[in-house]
Amino acid sequence: MASKQTFLQHLQSHYQAKLDRDYCTFPDADAASGKSAQLVLLNHYELLEVQGTDSERFLQGQLSCDVREVSMDSARWGTYNNAKGRMHASFLTSAAPDVEAGYHLRMATDVATHCREVLAKYIVFSKAEIQSLSDEWLVFGIT
């Protein structure tokens, strides 16, 4: 995963961050507090992107959350369930920052492929597309 290493090395060289495997600790901005910020790679999450003119309508009919409430300032938790109500995946839905009519679904990596395949069966009837962003995006947590 060259992109992860390149990004972490950039943080190290430009922000004096200390690297430790998938953790990145930043110098203390307030030495008196004794606290420092830490960036943690959440490689157990993957992002799926749904984009296109019908993306909102498609997702509104497939997911448990109200996609109309998702904005750049507001994400929503949701699930994707089968016809019998069994949950395939739970995720956090957010607006895609670089796509006008798009959404990101952050979910566990072990269910992302299955969820993408199932949603792809139905998305062909909409003016929307779904793709994995695992090769382009990394998911980090900040402590």
Question: What are these language model-derived features?
Answer:
Residues 1-143:
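Basic, glycine/lysine-rich polyanion-binding surfaces/domains
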